[in-house]
């Protein structure tokens, strides 16, 4: 997005500022369709995004006739806050600094000389499904690069180092406010700073994390973070910092604007004594999610298709109307821990009329994707991290 855009956050606020519980997901999964299938459209369709969000390159799978489990780079969603920076790869270096025993820097050739690792990972924007016009900020790619843990461990952590901050080349101005102890506003100024997010040292040295320079076997495109980005497979997109220039180990909690101000999930948590506590947590790790994406029929045989992601998935369950939960068949992705799973459920002899289809994902530890009336979802007051069970409506003739 260019400088004429307003921020995505402001755009969402201007469109109403109210949490939308019902979300939409468009996915025909044509690659696993039966010959001769006809798609039955859902009654509930996503609304058009407001102009500031029209350039996010959302995945509109119905229109694009998806034919691959891997999302092509040109169809991958693009979310940025300060635009795509101009980075000269020939002069670019990654700095490793802060509370490390051996501060150092790497150019791209030095990183490529390290042992290469690949991971198939479904990257999702933390605002995906928070509003009905944001259903496609997600994609699945094969990412390649150097293991982050090896680079950090070679630098060596000093005893005081507890948190790792990842800085991008994209920069912008942010308002800084002074707030008094009684809540009174003391002052404000604007500061220009690079985009940054952080995680703990233990989280940063997760063996799954990559300093990524390849996407789907090709050089990482500029729009997706070239020459180097962080790929952290257990985390929402906001933590997968693009256009990396600096990694700094610090001795305290990082409170940059995209860590402690903007990307916060606010929940109302009732206590047994009738009081309420409001919690504010930074958007962090991916959450369980599954959606019914398409219903198709051939020779009178109906089938529901969908996708699930966000954690190591053990199984997916689907129910129609108030019927029982039934196990879906995983068609693709079971062998990849961090990638979405495409699934289907045969729906024999459905009655004519309107039906509601709901799916839920269950991970390997037995955690179940929550229902919309679960306190974890019902008490949420922000649109980030929307992972309540999604119900789609369809009408059969």
Name each model-derived stretch.
Residues 10-32, 306:
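N-terminal export signals
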Residues 32-397:
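Structured, non-membrane catalytic/scaffold regions adjacent to prosthetic-group chemistry
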